C-alpha cells in the first residue's frame, strides 16, 4: 500500500479522541448559553463528509441542523443563520477561501464558530471562535462534536459506550484498509487484462 502509515492512523484517531473533554466543555457552554440551530459547513471533501454525517443525524436527532456548501452559503445566504446559530467547520489547511469567507459571513450574522483546523496559524483558524487543532479525519471530528451536542440534548444514551469502543478505532481502521487492499489487489490481478 502506498503511503500507508499505521502509526499515523492511530495517532490521528487518538489526537481527536483526546479532545473529548475539551469538546464536551465547549458544547456544554454553548448549550447553557442557548442556540437555535447548527450549521455544518464544508467544501469539497469536508462537505462530502458532513453530508454523510447528516444522513445519521436526520434519523437520530431532533436538533435543527443545516448542511451548507461554503461557496453556496456565501452566494445565497441562509435566513436561518443568526446570533443563535452554531457553525461547525473542519479544515486541514485553513486556507480555503470559500471556507474562510463562509466563516466571516457566519460571524457577521452573529453565529458562534466552532471548528477543527489542523493549521492553527491559518486564516480560517484565526476566524474560528472555538478552535481545536489536531490531525485526523474530518468525519471523526464532526462526529465527536455532534455526538456531544446529542448527549447534551439527551439524544445519545450510548455516548460513554461509543468512547469505550472508539479506543480500538485506530486498529479497526488499519485492519479495514489492509483487507480492502487485499481485495483490490485480488480484483486487479483477476481483471487487470480484461477488455473493456
Predicted regions and their residues:
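A short N-terminal beta->alpha junction/helix N-cap motif
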Residues: 14, 18, 41-44
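Oxyanion-binding "anion nests"
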Residues: 196
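A short, well-structured juxtamembrane/interface segment
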Residues: 15-34, 176-193
Amino acid at each position: 500500500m502506498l503511503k500507508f502509515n499505521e502509526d499515523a492512523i492511530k495517532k490521528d484517531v487518538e489526537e481527536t479522541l483526546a479532545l473529548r473533554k475539551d469538546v464536551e466543555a465547549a458544547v456544554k457552554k454553548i448549550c447553557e448559553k442557548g442556540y437555535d440551530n447548527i450549521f455544518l459547513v464544508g467544501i469539497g471533501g469536508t462537505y462530502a463528509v458532513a453530508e454523510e454525517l447528516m444522513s445519521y443525524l436526520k434519523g437520530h436527532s431532533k436538533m435543527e441542523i443545516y448542511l451548507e456548501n461554503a461557496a453556496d452559503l456565501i452566494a445565497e445566504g441562509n435566513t436561518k443563520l443568526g446570533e443563535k446559530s452554531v457553525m461547525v467547520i473542519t479544515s486541514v489547511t485553513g486556507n480555503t477561501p470559500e471556507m474562510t469567507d463562509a466563516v466571516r459571513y457566519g460571524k457577521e450574522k452573529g453565529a458562534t464558530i466552532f471548528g477543527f483546523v489542523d493549521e492553527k496559524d491559518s486564516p480560517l483558524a484565526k476566524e474560528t471562535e472555538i478552535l481545536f487543532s489536531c490531525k485526523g479525519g474530518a468525519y471523526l471530528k464532526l462526529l465527536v462534536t455532534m455526538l456531544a451536542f446529542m448527549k447534551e440534548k439527551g439524544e445519545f444514551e450510548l455516548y460513554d459506550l461509543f468512547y469505550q469502543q472508539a479506543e480500538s478505532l485506530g486498529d479497526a481502521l488499519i485492519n479495514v484498509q489492509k483487507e480492502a487492499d487485499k481485495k483490490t489487489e485480488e480484483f486487479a490481478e483477476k481483471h487487470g487484462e480484461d477488455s473493456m
